[in-house]
């Protein structure tokens, strides 16, 4: 048994010696990963389907709802129940419904999406720039952290983040907290972005302080 443990420990030390000197490269990889996600998702905000697809987040968020004209308004549905107006004008991805698109134009959905997308792409660029410029990278990392906090708040403000109880032939056993829907499962991953942003920011902060020595 001692022989096996010795071999195992030797292997672990061998791997550690390879990985340890690459810490800076791995942190740069975090920056690249954050940039890819930010640039891709932020860039897609100019697309109609993506702008429509964030309406539930924006309408329910205290940070963003002011960007919409109608989305947060309460209106009666076909059953006479009061619901947020955006719920009556959802466009499934890949489906074009003219009356819904017109409503989103009047709502300011697309303008808001362009603004949000530009902010996301800018944060991604600043984070990536941390590879070469510590000050820009510090700003980008902290903004990534802050943006992740806002995104994670959608778990609290967005009803669609949790599996609903839609009924059926049998009782629904798993709905509400802690049962994340597809929307919620997408949002919860921003915890990784939060950690990555802080890691990138801390490395830039150390480089800035090192200049003073």
UniProtKB/Swiss-Prot annotation:
The chain crosses the membrane at residues 26-46, 112-132, 136-156. One of its GO terms (biological process) is response to hypochlorite. Its main location: membrane. It is a multi-pass membrane protein. It is found in: Cell membrane. Keywords: Cell membrane, Membrane, Transmembrane, Transmembrane helix. It comes from the Bacteria. GO terms for cellular component: plasma membrane. The keyword Transferase does not apply. This is Uncharacterized protein HI_0219.
């Amino acid at each position: 048994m001692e022989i096996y443990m010795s071999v195992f420990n030797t292997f672990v030390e061998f791997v550690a010696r390879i990985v340890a000197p690459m810490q800076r490269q791995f942190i740069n990889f975090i920056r690249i990963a954050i940039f890819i996600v930010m640039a891709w998702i932020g860039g897609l905000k100019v697309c109609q389907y993506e702008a429509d697809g964030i309406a539930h987040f924006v309408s329910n968020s205290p940070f963003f709802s002011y960007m919409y004209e109608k989305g947060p308004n309460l209106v009666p549905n076909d059953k006479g129940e009061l619901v947020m107006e955006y719920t009556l004008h959802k466009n499934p991805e890949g489906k074009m419904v003219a009356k819904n698109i017109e409503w989103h134009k009047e709502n300011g959905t697309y303008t808001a999406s362009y603004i949000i997308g530009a902010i996301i792409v800018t944060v991604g660029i600043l984070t990536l720039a941390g590879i070469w410029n510590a000050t820009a990278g510090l700003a980008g990392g902290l903004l990534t952290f802050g943006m992740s906090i806002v995104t994670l708040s959608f778990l609290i403000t967005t009803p669609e983040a949790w599996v609903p109880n839609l009924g059926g032939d049998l009782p629904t056993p798993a709905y509400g907290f802690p049962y994340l829907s597809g929307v919620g499962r997408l949002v919860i991953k921003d915890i990784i972005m939060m950690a990555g942003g802080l890691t990138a920011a801390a490395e830039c902060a150390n480089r800035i302080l090192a200049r003073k020595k």
